[in-house]
Amino acid sequence: MDAPAVPNLTAPRPTPAGRRDLSTLPKAHLHLHFTGAMRPSTMVDMARTQGVRLPPNLLHVDAASMPADGRGWFRFQRAYDSARHLVRSEAAMRRLIREAAEDDAAEGSVRMEIQADPTSYAPYVGGITPALEIIIDEARSASRDTGVDIGVIVAASRMKHPLDARTLARLAASFA
């Protein structure tokens, strides 16, 4: 399967004349969604490795030129779910966090807060506790290696039962 050309969305652009270079200012990246942090090139690589065909709209990186019939919450959610279903291992989970930290460091971030719902990855790593342990462990390691302070926010899906959220809140509290 030939991978489509995927632009590097994290490469700094040249600073226009007369403007200050914003890459030199410290930044904080808040409420970064775990799967949403995935590099397009990583998504293509994971899909290729797993033999998964990605929906064409998932690689449409210029939202402004996307046709109106390709937009909307439910279309977005289906595309997001397609990307999330590629994260099926501890190695994939660690890769997402590591790359997000590297990208944020390259952009001048000093703080990153990544939010993840461990139930999405639990089936592949032995449960919600191991899933959260992997996320926290890699966040610590990536923080040490990149210099970006990384916080982890445990998220709960509003589409699931409220008792699931209570379980996740208790799990998060046990790591606080």
Report the location of each language-model feature:
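Metal-cofactor-binding active-site regions of metalloenzymes
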Residues: 2-176
